[in-house]
Regions:
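Short, well-ordered junction/capping motifs at the entry into regular secondary structure
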Residues: 1-42, 98
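Surface-exposed recognition segments
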Residues: 20-24, 40-122
C-alpha cells in the first residue's frame, strides 16, 4: 500500500525548523499509479461524489443511483468515498462510504475531476 496510497502511518513529516509532527494531504502524483494508471485513489483525501447521500436499501445493488435532489427538510449531504491521510489502511478503499454536508469544508476531503477519454485528439 505504501507505494500507491497515503494513510495515517505514512503521511507525517517534520517541516524544517519545526518541532512536532504535522499531518496534511500530499501533492497529487507523488506515489505510483494503481493498476489502472490512476493516481492517489487510495488515501490522501477522501473524495466527495456527485451522488446525494441516503441509506442503502436492504437488497444488494450494483452501482445504485440516488435521487436527483433531496427534500429540503432532509440534511443535504453528498457521498464521500475512500479514506484519507487521517484514516487507517483498511478505510483507504474506494468502497468506503460516508456522508459529507454540502455546506462544510474540510482538509480531509477533496474531489476528482473526471473526463471521458477523447478519441483522435491531436
Amino acid at each position: 500500500f505504501d507505494e500507491v496510497g497515503y494513510n495515517l502511518s505514512n503521511c507525517y513529516r517534520l517541516p524544517e525548523g519545526q518541532t512536532g509532527m504535522q499531518f496534511w494531504p500530499e501533492e497529487v502524483g507523488k506515489k505510483l499509479p494503481n493498476e489502472l494508471g490512476l493516481y492517489d485513489m487510495s488515501g490522501n483525501v477522501a473524495e466527495v461524489c456527485l451522488d446525494w447521500y441516503d441509506e442503502y436499501g436492504g437488497e444488494d445493488q450494483v452501482d445504485p443511483v440516488g435521487p436527483d435532489a433531496l427534500p429540503s427538510d432532509v440534511p443535504q449531504k453528498r457521498i464521500c468515498r475512500g479514506g484519507g491521510w487521517n484514516t487507517n489502511t483498511s478505510a483507504c478503499r474506494v468502497s468506503a462510504r460516508a456522508a459529507f454536508p454540502v455546506d462544510k469544508r474540510n482538509k480531509l476531503i477533496g474531489f476528482r475531476l473526471v473526463h471521458p477519454k477523447l478519441e483522435n485528439v491531436q
